[in-house]
Structure formats: C-alpha cells, structure tokens
Amino acid sequence: MSTEMLGLILAGGKGTRLGKLTSDQAKPAVPFGGRYRIIDFTLSNCANSGVKNIGIITQYQPLLLNEHIGNGVSWGLDGLNASATILQPYTDNSGSKWFEGTAHAIYQNIDYIDSKDPEYVLILSGDHIYKMDYESMLEEHIKNGASLTVAVIDVPMKEASRFGIMNTDVSGRITEFEEKPEHPKSNHASMGIYIFNWKRLREVLTTGFTTNDDMVDFGKNVIPYYLKSDERVFAYHFSGYWKDVGTIDSLWAANMEFLDGSDGLNLYDRSWRIYSKNPIDPAQVITENAEVNNSMIVDGCYVDGTINHSILSTDVDVQRGSEITDSVIMPGVKIGKDVVIKHAIVGENAQIGDGAVVEGNKDNIKVIGNSERIGVLPNED
C-alpha cells in the first residue's frame, strides 16, 4: 500500500556530550521530564500529525530504545494502516557497514522505504524536545512545489555560528547553506527536519555521488548538492519551543524550564499530547515527614525527605532526612538517609548511600551515571 509521507527518525546517536548518561543507551532513550524519554516527543509529533508509518533508524546501544518503542502501540502506531519499524545496520552481499551519517543511514534503508512506496519522506532527529505539526510543513512543501523543505528556527544572531544556517530570498527559497559560518548572513538555523520528494532523493542518493564517502550527511553533502543542482529548496519557519538537549547543561536547563512553566514546553496541552511507554506503577507516597516545594513527583515514588524545585522520575525512593534541590532524578534511583543533592542529574537506577553529598552549581551540573553507586549502601558497612 502506498504511503503519502513516510516518517524516518534518526535515532542512532551516541550523545557523547551527555557523558555518563549515554554510556549504556542511545541519546534518544535518555529520560526527560519525569515520565518521558527524549524520542517520545518526535514519535508523538508524528502521531499527532497523522504520520502513521515510521521507520526508526538505530545504531548505538539500541536495546533500551528498542524495548521502549516496541511495536509503537503507545503512540497508536500498531493499527492496520500504521507501523513502527526498527531499522538497524545490517550486512548484505554488497558488504554494507555501519551508518556513517544521516544521509548514509537513509541510503542503507532504501529497500524499506521503497516497500512503503511514499510520495514524500519526512526525515527527523530523535533527540530534540519540541512539538510540531508536520502536516502543516507538508502543505507548505506542496504549495511551494518544492523538491526539499528544511525546517528552520530563528536563533539569536550571536549564536548563529553554532548552527547550519539557511539564507533565503523573499519567497522563502533557500539560496545558500552555510555550516556553522564564522560570519553568518542570517539567523535561520536548520532544525535537522526535512521533507523530500522521495523519487528525487532516491535518485540523488543512488546516482548523484561518486562514492558513499561523498554522501554521508544531509547538511554537508545532500543539501549543497540540491542547491548546486538548482532544485527548489524552501525553508519552513518554526516559531515554537525547540531544544537541543545534547549537553548536560541543556538537558538540566530544559527540565528546569519544564518545571517552571516559563518559556518551556506545555506538556498539559490535551490537544497535542506527548505519549510514552509508561509502566503501571502505584501512586506516589509522600510521608508526613516529607516536604515538597515546586517539584514534580511521578508515580511509583516514595518520598520521606525534602524536595525543592526538582523532578523525581518513576520509582525513585528518597529516605528520611535527605534534601534534593534543583535536580533531576531519573527512574529507579534509590537515595538513602541524610543525603544532600543540589544542581545535579542522577542517572537511572543509581544508588546514593546514607549521608552522601552530591553537589554542583548552575554553571557546573553534577552528574551521577546510570547504575552508579555512591557512598555506603545498606549491608555494605
């Protein structure tokens, strides 16, 4: 059956700047906002936009991510005319190898894409926090008679040199692409979201480059090729909330923004829900000794200490006398008695022993890795 627009989520990133938090899982699988994982936002955008057939391209440490996505039922992607397909690197008679970049990952999955027979392909990153209607982007793509549409967001001019910058004419047609320019001409930053006409992209990927080494990334290789070939390439301007949470500081800050409800993402919007695979946990327990101020305590938590301006994800235990401030505690963490945690991110299933101090500051967030053990734990003294 033909699919008008097929979604392809690039979810194989290692996320090296997140350090300990991605030592055993891909960046899109990192928890966010108490009950979500980063990839939930892209998957939910697809579901809410009516993009019901999605390929998720994974590579680095995919086990947890694959288990989280499953057959896509949590996002309504398991119906008769819907699907969520995990796509991993494989070897065939041509000697295929690891995905070397964004464009190469799509090239290696041409057979899957052809099986869906799409008119358009929507290529997405699985590691950003945002809400976006891809249907509106497709409508503009068709209206412009575009061969490629690139989603862009305006960033402060002083930060533009950190991004791939799209320079456009008055009609919104992209005339020039600059990868992290020293002296940017505009502030239209690429979001790494693309809509391509599939037949043309397929032709470019299979015949447009001399070797696979010339066809690694969309930003470095494919977009410049389209512009050089005078293809109709347009910018789609997005003005909503969008965060790249690829560093410890940005991940911590985005969680705090969500908690404050200032310019952060509204996760309580019933017209555009963010879905996730959530276990069925008992209600949280907050004892009479506990004190909670401006914090989020998710299902399955036990709190017998003081929580200030922090997020406690599912199944977190905080024993008596402990104090947590300005911190993000990820799922399954066990915190003993009289512990102090400030300006920190504590990774999944970590254990913090009695009396331990985990303290950073706004300019230097302290990180405890997944399953890391700190201090003296019960039965170890």
Curated annotation (Swiss-Prot):
Homotetramer. InterPro entries: ADP-Glc_PPase, ADP_Glu_pyroP_CS, GlgC_bac, GlmU/GlgC-like_hexapep, NTP_transferase_dom, Nucleotide-diphossugar_trans, Trimer_LpxA-like_sf. It comes from the Bacteria. Alpha-D-glucose 1-phosphate binds at residues 164, 179-180, 190. Involved in the biosynthesis of ADP-glucose, a building block required for the elongation reactions to produce glycogen. Catalyzes the reaction between ATP and alpha-D-glucose 1-phosphate (G1P) to produce pyrophosphate and ADP-Glc. The keyword ATP-binding applies. GO terms for biological process: glycogen biosynthetic process. NCBIfam families: glgC, PRK05293.1. Its EC number is 2.7.7.27. HAMAP family: GlgC (MF_00624). This is Glucose-1-phosphate adenylyltransferase. Belongs to the bacterial/plant glucose-1-phosphate adenylyltransferase family. It is an enzyme of class 2 (transferase). It holds the Pfam family NTP_transferase. The keyword Signal does not apply. It catalyses: alpha-D-glucose 1-phosphate + ATP + H(+) = ADP-alpha-D-glucose + diphosphate.
